[in-house]
Amino acid sequence: MLSFLSSNLSSTRQSLAQVLNFALVLSTAFMLWKGLSVFTASSSPIVVVLSGSMEPAFQRGDLLFLWNRSPRAELGEIVVYNVRGKDIPIVHRVVRTFPEVEGKAKKVKEITGTSSIPPNMLLTKGDNNVADDTELYAKNQDFLHREEDIVGSVRGYMPMVGYVTIMLSEHPWLKTVLLGIMGLMVILQREQ
């Protein structure tokens, strides 16, 4: 009877240790993500290219690393932005900037009482697209505001690494298969 209680207590401890290890892995991943977000000043410091609109620069499935600490976006820079009201990151190149001229700064000072310059305004386009992105922007929006709409500027990439996330979102049954394989591995590992 005592050996039964001892083995039962031991298996409970092992189960609890596995749960705590899993929680540790999840919390570590979350903290790394948040730390990277703070370091890059981007809400999403890593994104996956979802379409072929930026070919040949980036292919579908490429993993992009973003940086959002620059106060202005330059002509030709590749940026990631979210359309207002939608949470789909779009990766396109800045094809036109609307720099604030001195007259605008004076007008802003007259209206607001401060001489702060309005945000950098941008027009973007995919390298593989015929037209600019004005049709993709929110209703009544003709350009992007650097501070409001831009998630970050592309600073690096890893080819095809993000294709796994595309496959998992396009084929939901793959998630089930993957979870089943991981569960089977946990069960088999426990028996040893």
Curated annotation (Swiss-Prot):
Region C-terminal short (CTS) helix, residue ranges: 177-188
Parts of the chain on the Lumenal side: 40-192
Highest taxon of source: Eukaryota
Membrane topology (Cytoplasmic): 1-18
Keywords, in A-Z order: Endoplasmic reticulum, Hydrolase, Membrane, Protease, Signal-anchor, Transmembrane, Transmembrane helix
NCBIfam families: sigpep_I_arch (TIGR02228)
Family in the record: Belongs to the peptidase S26B family.
Protein name: Signal peptidase complex catalytic subunit sec11
